[in-house]
Amino acid sequence: MAGAIASRMSFSSLKRKQPKTFTVRIVTMDAEMEFNCEMKWKGKDLFDLVCRTLGLRETWFFGLQYTIKDTVAWLKMDKKVLDHDVSKEEPVTFHFLAKFYPENAEEELVQEITQHLFFLQVKKQILDEKVYCPPEASVLLASYAVQAKYGDYDPSVHKRGFLAQEELLPKRVINLYQMTPEMWEERITAWYAEHRGRARDEAEMEYLKIAQDLEMYGVNYFTIRNKKGTELLLGVDALGLHIYDPENRLTPKISFPWNEIRNISYSDKEFTIKPLDKKIDVFKFNSSKLRVNKLILQLCIGNHDLFMRRRKADSLEVQQMKAQAREEKARKQMERQRLAREKQMREEAERTRDELERRLLQMKEEATMANEALMRSEETADLLAEKAQITEEEAKLLAQKAAEAEQEMQRIKATAIRTEEEKRLMEQKVLEAEVLALKMAEESERRAKEADQLKQDLQEAREAERRAKQKLLEIATKPTYPPMNPIPPPLPPDIPSFDIIADSLSFDFKDTDMKRLSMEIEKEKVEYMEKSKHLQEQLNELKTEIEALKLKERETALDVLHSESSDRGGPSSKHNTIKKLTLQSAKSRVAFFEEL
């Protein structure tokens, strides 16, 4: 009895000690999170918690991924988390990733967080070379990635070498050309500078719009065998099922769009596809593992559901999300316009300030020069006045000497000289006196003229001094800065106002705003068509420019296939490729698959 009681107590003690929660680590493309989950939680409980934490509403694109023996698997929504074949060592790790891809990113991805997560995932796939990207397109995509990270190009900030530590191009592309990192940076920056004015979300969307036309974008590949045992690749994506040659993942041999497929099932390793047309025989293939068949079926069901959903009217939830996204986009656009106006006004004010500072410096230099000129004029005037005084005194002295000489001459003439010798001597003295008097008169006249000239120079110097003082006075009294209005001008009446109350944001729309936005969207469509043509021309130009630097011996098999496709004038997009492949009847395509 005592033993039974002790056994029951031990069992209940053990039961109480069992943990009620377990730790889960969620790894997104740019962050890690940890949660405490209840033991009974199903996949949907954990998935919903992650989506709420991220603020993500477009949940149908994403899933929680884990790995089983080198095979990718996804958490099932209706199954307990711990019932999956996952490591029981805590924290249990899952990767939050896009499981399904949109046909048209711009039309289908509504939330900014959704766009951002797709951008990060696709960028990593391209850099890790899981998605093939031609070299010229890699440079363009890199320029949009730089715009998304750094904002508008500013030569004073983004100086040479600012991309040195960034991973922007696949290593395959870098190794394919005889180009230095500086040469790659120069070409990326040239395109980066053209993206001025694009916000982060716009740059990321442009990245996705280009990436979605890459042949391997959004395709999950699986090794299969047909009835004849031929090894092939099955590609599952948003458009349908595609069959590839194992050596060529770029262009499928045949395709089956989702609207032609009625049923998909598997038994053990055998997979069965039933076409919509019941007259057409089913076609089967075998995969390598049962676990792979489960993954293929999951991807087929999810992609098929999304394919059909896109071709129906949007649900109320999606309509609300799109309306909110349009409003948010309009609000951000107006906010960017306001910031652009403020930036322009600030730049104009800075330019005005710089101009005024330059003018002030110039006026200070002019004032300094005027002061120096005034000082020189005053010194010159003093010297001229002193020289004029000396000259005047010398002239007076010479005049006095001339008068004395005249008096001496008159006295000599009046003296009676009785002898011829005395007369001759006297005449000689008279002659000398006359010559001396004449020289004195000429010197006196010259000194008088010099005195007059000095007086004239003195007057001119005083006039220059007066003008210098007048100019200095003008500089001193001139206003340095024009009156500045410290209050920025009010926004135009057609710009809606923003009222922030506590943590909420109120935004009032007017009909004119939505009409203007609609007109802008239509205008953007036309501009996009023109830009696409211009973009293709730029890509071709860059391709031609760097072609001479290509090292042919380093080309991969995919590089060769892409070059051959381009030389043959290959299709411009994946959609065109699939469209051409489905021109034949489904029956003939099934037969072709069986004969591969």
UniProtKB/Swiss-Prot annotation:
Keyword Calcium (UniProt): no
UniProt note: phenotype after gene disruption: Mice are born with abnormally small lenses with serious structural defects. Failure of lens vesicle separation and the resulting changes in cell organization causes lenses to herniate, leading to expulsion of lens fiber cells through a perforation in the cornea. Developing lenses show loss of cell apical-basal polarity, failure of the lens vesicle to separate from the surface ectoderm, failure to properly exit the cell cycle during fiber cell differentiation and incomplete terminal differentiation of fiber cells.
PROSITE patterns in alphabetical order: FERM_1, FERM_2, FERM_3
Sites bearing Phosphoserine, chain numbering: S13, S518
Post-translational modifications reported in the UniProt record: Phosphorylation of Ser-518 inhibits nuclear localization by disrupting the intramolecular association of the FERM domain with the C-terminal tail. The dephosphorylation of Ser-518 favors the interaction with NOP53.
Region annotation (Disordered) ranges: 560-580
Domain called FERM: residue spans: 22-311
Taxonomy, superkingdom: Eukaryota
GO BP term, pick one: positive regulation of stress fiber assembly
One Gene Ontology term of the molecular function aspect: actin binding
InterPro entries: Band_41_domain, ERM, ERM_C_dom, ERM_FERM_C, ERM_helical, Ez/rad/moesin-like, FERM/acyl-CoA-bd_prot_sf, FERM_2
UniProtKB keywords: Cell membrane, Cell projection, Cytoplasm, Cytoskeleton, Membrane, Nucleus, Phosphoprotein, Tumor suppressor, Ubl conjugation
GO cellular component, one term: apical part of cell
Subcellular location(s) of the protein: Cell membrane; Cell projection; Cytoplasm, Cytoskeleton; Nucleus
Membrane association type: Peripheral membrane protein
Subunit description: Interacts with NHERF1, HGS and AGAP2. Interacts with SGSM3. Interacts (via FERM domain) with MPP1. Interacts with LAYN. Interacts with WWC1. Interacts with the CUL4A-RBX1-DDB1-VprBP/DCAF1 E3 ubiquitin-protein ligase complex. The unphosphorylated form interacts (via FERM domain) with VPRBP/DCAF1. Interacts (via FERM domain) with NOP53; the interaction is direct. Interacts with SCHIP1; the interaction is direct.
Function description: Probable regulator of the Hippo/SWH (Sav/Wts/Hpo) signaling pathway, a signaling pathway that plays a pivotal role in tumor suppression by restricting proliferation and promoting apoptosis. Along with WWC1 can synergistically induce the phosphorylation of LATS1 and LATS2 and can probably function in the regulation of the Hippo/SWH (Sav/Wts/Hpo) signaling pathway. May act as a membrane stabilizing protein. May inhibit PI3 kinase by binding to AGAP2 and impairing its stimulating activity.
Annotated protein name in UniProt: Merlin
Upper classification of the organism: Eukaryota, Metazoa, Chordata, Craniata, Vertebrata
